[in-house]
Amino acid sequence: MFIDKARIFVKAGNGGNGSVAFRREKYVPAGGPDGGDGGRGASIIFEVDLGLRTLMDFKYQKKYQAQNGGDGSKGKRAGKNGENLVLKVPAGTVIRDEATGLVLADLKKEGDTAIVAKGGIGGKGNQHFANAVRQAPAFAKSGTDGEERWITLELKMIADVGLLGFPNVGKSTFLSVVTKAKPKIANYHFTTLTPNLGVVQTKFGDSFVLADIPGIIEGASEGIGLGHEFLRHVERTKVLIHIVDISGLEGRDPIEDFDKINDELKLYNEKLSKRPQVVVANKFDILEDESKFEKFKSELEGRGYTVFKMSAATRQGIDEVIAYVSKMLKEVEDVELVSEEEMYRPELDIGTEEELSIDIEDGVYVVTGKALRRIMYSVNFDDMESLQYFQKAMESQGVFDRLREMGIEDGDVVKIYELEFEFYN
């Protein structure tokens, strides 16, 4: 089964927690803190595998969770780092963040990789918080949470040239003649149900990749026929070969066919509709009135297109088409599928990591924030030094300033997750 789109959830591993421990050895009555650091959480990485052709692996498994980092322990022993989860995808896979619509990665060639969810950082053990005044800190830092997000995967095949045209105009026959590809060929509409790729070797030693997609019909943009879903597989192409049936045996007008296909192309993607097109009038060998071709050629050349006559079945005119397209490819610039504006930029992502929220519920000031929660869960509130550390963290996070701005008064109740206390300046 050919699967070219998938929606999955990815969750990187959390960082391990730092340890609160003290050195305990015979003859060493006051060994000091020796809690180790937490391990790094595993990240989720996507990598190109040239052996893959579809996104089938993501059809049935929708959620992926990477390993958490191990907690630190006594003796300054660090927790184990999580092992990164590497997911393989075909070349041409575009990964998009569902929440923002931004592109996280466009994986185009062998060796391309992308981290789409970073693992959390391990927390520091209590050994790091000892100083001349605080010699036995009874607290450590918790590990940070790993990133999580819903993402969409879209396979947009890597091809230099794409074939366009109505069903049954001879695209698959053309592909089979000029490449070693073996697409299904029959005399009925929608014989091709999945995209096909083939490599064209020219007589001059050049080569290029040719993509044949299922035929498009009028109304494809509204879901008629096979819809326009497969058009994504010609988005990367530099040149389009637009094949029409010039024979008229099915009673169609080749100029109308040409215009209808381009109308659907424009509805799907304005940029794609402006891609250079070479027009090929196929089935010329069974055309009874050659003046029909001359009329077609005159009309299209008047619009600025280059027009060839061809018979894919008898191979007449094929060499001329291939030579011309090969020459065009050297003159046309590569296609940048994803613009800079569409790309995700981590440095601009403020995210929710350090966001602080304070709401008043039934007279209680409810404070939430990921950073604050991590600090709170790492503190021993029965220990005065730990409590002082937490108060300083609250101050540095701007909690007290925000509470004062909201009009808090002495004796008002503040709730931070499971912790409740009365506020006093």
UniProtKB/Swiss-Prot annotation:
InterPro entries: G_OBG, GTP-bd, GTP-bd_Obg/CgtA, GTP-bd_prot_GTP1/OBG_C_sf, GTP1-OBG_CS, GTP1_OBG_dom, GTP1_OBG_dom_sf, OBG_GTPase. GO terms for molecular function: GTP binding; GTPase activity; magnesium ion binding. Gene3D superfamilies: GTP-binding protein OBG, C-terminal domain (3.30.300.350), GTP1/OBG domain (2.70.210.12), P-loop containing nucleotide triphosphate hydrolases (3.40.50.300). The keyword DNA-binding does not apply. Its cofactor is Mg(2+). GO terms for biological process: ribosome biogenesis. Residues 1-158 form the Obg domain. GTP binds at residues 165-172, 190-194, 212-215, 282-285, 311-313. CDD domains: Obg. It is an enzyme of class 3 (hydrolase). Residues 159-330 form the OBG-type G domain. Keywords: Cytoplasm, GTP-binding, Hydrolase, Magnesium, Metal-binding, Nucleotide-binding. One of its GO terms (cellular component) is cytoplasm. Residues 344-425 form the OCT domain. Its EC number is 3.6.5.-. It is found in: Cytoplasm. The keyword tRNA-binding does not apply. Mg(2+) binds at residues 172, 192. It comes from the Bacteria. NCBIfam families: Obg_CgtA, Obg_CgtA_exten, PRK12296.1, PRK12297.1, PRK12299.1. Monomer. Belongs to the TRAFAC class OBG-HflX-like GTPase superfamily. OBG GTPase family. An essential GTPase which binds GTP, GDP and possibly (p)ppGpp with moderate affinity, with high nucleotide exchange rates and a fairly low GTP hydrolysis rate. Plays a role in control of the cell cycle, stress response, ribosome biogenesis and in those bacteria that undergo differentiation, in morphogenesis control. This is GTPase Obg. It comes from Clostridioides difficile (strain 630) (Peptoclostridium difficile).
